[in-house]
Amino acid sequence: MTLLSGKTTLVLCLSSILCGCTTNGLPTPYSINLSFPVITQNQINSGGYYINDAEQIRTTDGLCLDAGPDQQNRLTLRECKHVQSQLFSFHRDRITQGEKCLDAAGQGTKEGTPIILYSCTGNDNQRWLTDDNKIKGKQSRKCLGTNSIIVRKGDPVVLADCDFSRALEFTIR
């Protein structure tokens, strides 16, 4: 069995009894290639794409980053559930969900800039570092946070000064 392009190829050789093959120079055994999708534990199929190794980004307050469809790509904090809108993948300095990247809207660098999901461009406003359980924008040097000191379900996720209480601390699960 070999793994190739997200599919498993199984090569079967028919025995000499079934195909009349011999080992003394006559025709070699036949091969049949069968392809079928491989489903892994962390794989989610939705809209034709897969999220591999997807994880929740949880606050220390027990809420999760959520990019639900009713939020128009804006991230908010929601009760943690195992739903696609709360699963993110980590690729070096990018955080993605499907084909979209975590993005400081409008290439913003100021406190209060909304965090959204946006088509991946490779710009620095889509690059993130982790430091002391915080997620910090490479371009802005600001952390993911909220506009209020008291974190509540439904709060929008924005850029916040990393040294103040509006910056959120996260665990990845």
UniProtKB/Swiss-Prot annotation:
Cell location: Cell membrane
Keyword Signal: yes
Lipidation (N-palmitoyl cysteine): C21
Annotated coiled-coil segments of the chain: none
Listed SMART domains: RICIN
Signal peptide (from-to): 1-20
Keyword check for Signal: yes
Predominant localisation class: membrane
Cross-referenced InterPro entries: Ricin_B-like_lectins, Ricin_B_lectin
Protein name, as recorded: Probable lipoprotein EnvE
One cellular-component annotation, GO: plasma membrane
Lipid bilayer topology: Lipid-anchor
Transmembrane segments: none
Pfam families: Ricin_B_lectin
Lipid-binding residues (covalent, S-diacylglycerol cysteine): C21
Originating gene: envE
Keywords, sorted A to Z: Cell membrane, Lipoprotein, Membrane, Palmitate, Signal
